[in-house]
Amino acid sequence: MKYSQFLTEHARLCVLRTLTESAGYQSNSSLLRDHLEAYALHLSADQINAVLAWLVEQGLVTTEALGSVQVVTITQRGMDVARGVATVPGVRRPSPGE
């Protein structure tokens, strides 16, 4: 697996896990980018938008434009993937105990 693919799969999982811990199960794209940075996942704004668009296509999150950011809300399917109860190719599966 290429490093870029590994990074993308990890970023997708990180977004989902962040949303499961957020009040109302939602956040905005700017805060999500900052959270990824804290985990040494350095993605551009365009890359974050691509990650979010992919997660929407998979039915794992919904988004709503609000000014220059997107408000992102996790779906039940996304919560299942974040917990490792369900798997989606393209999202890193959490390790036991994560």
What would you call each of these model-derived segments?
Residues 76-98:
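Short, amphipathic alpha-helical interaction segments positioned at domain boundaries
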Residues 1-26:
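Short alpha-helical segments that sit at the start of domains
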Residues 33-43:
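Short helix-coil junctions and helix-kink-helix linkers
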Residues 42-57:
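Short amphipathic alpha-helical interaction segments
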Residues 56-66:
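A short, conserved structural fragment
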Residues 68-74:
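Minor-groove-contacting beta-hairpin "wing" of winged helix-turn-helix DNA-binding domains
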Residues 25-35:
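Short acidic, hydrophobic short linear motifs in intrinsically disordered regions
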